[in-house]
């Protein structure tokens, strides 16, 4: 069936993703060319698990029980000049204020100026959606006219009716600032839909 072949092709495409580099300084970034899709979300929102599920790899992005463990921009190369970028979780780990300020300045500058950035995937725990930093990420995308797609992760933690109601509420509140879907790394709900968005942005 054509539809099944299409989904399989998308899975294979993202499953080629491999670790490229981690950067905590501008000079460590790859050349600002090609196409990059960033993944952002609160600590413990399930961002690393979502990346792993979408790429059909268990250990591509490291998951941690410690909030804010990802402290750098982590680049995964899907194809030459086609990257998935894992941003530090907001609500950073307990670190010195000067280090936290450095991260914030670095990430803010990257979001505002990176020309290769073509889309932002914003990962939110469905039980705690649209917190302050989630809205700030949507504002970054909207200010740059970048598409934003929201994953309401851990959808399996709510009943079907409650999950559907949350989806409708978030969709209403976001308005034109982004699209939104249900997602679960555990049950695989929404993985094909999320892959389709990302592969389209990367022009794969």
What residue spans do the PLM features occupy?
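Glycine-rich, phosphate-binding/catalytic loops in enzymes
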Residues: 56-57, 100-103, 137-140, 166-169, ...
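Conserved G1/Walker A P-loop phosphate-binding module
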Residues: 6-94
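Residue-level signal for inorganic ion chemistry
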Residues: 76, 153, 194
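Switch II of P-loop NTPase G domains
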Residues: 29, 67-74, 88-118, 126-140
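Conserved C-terminal guanine-recognition region of P-loop GTPase G domains, centered on the G4
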Residues: 108-178
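Conserved nucleotide-binding/hydrolysis micro-motifs of P-loop NTPases
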Residues: 24, 69, 82, 89-92, ...
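Canonical P-loop GTPase G-domain recognition
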Residues: 14-26, 157-204
């Amino acid at each position: 069936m054509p539809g099944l072949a299409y989904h399989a092709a998308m899975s294979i495409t993202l499953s080629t993703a491999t670790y490229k580099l981690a950067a905590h300084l501008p000079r460590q970034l790859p050349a600002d060319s090609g196409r990059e899709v960033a993944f952002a979300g609160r600590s413990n929102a399930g961002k690393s698990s979502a990346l792993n599920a979408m790429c059909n790899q268990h250990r591509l992005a490291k998951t941690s029980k410690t909030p804010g463990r990802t402290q750098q921009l982590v680049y995964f190369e899907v194809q030459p000049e086609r990257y998935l970028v894992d941003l530090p979780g907001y609500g950073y780990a307990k670190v010195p204020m000067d280090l936290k300020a450095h991260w914030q300045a670095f990430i803010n500058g990257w979001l505002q100026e990176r020309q290769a950035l073509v889309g932002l995937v914003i990962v939110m725990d469905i039980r705690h959606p649209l917190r302050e930093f989630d809205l700030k990420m949507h504002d970054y995308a909207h200010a740059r006219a970048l598409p934003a797609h929201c994953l309401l992760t851990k959808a399996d933690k709510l009943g079907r009716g409650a999950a559907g109601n949350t989806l409708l509420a978030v969709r209403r509140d976001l308005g034109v600032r982004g699209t939104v879907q249900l997602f679960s790394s555990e049950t695989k709900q929404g993985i094909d839909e999320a892959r389709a968005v990302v592969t389209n942005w990367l022009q794969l």
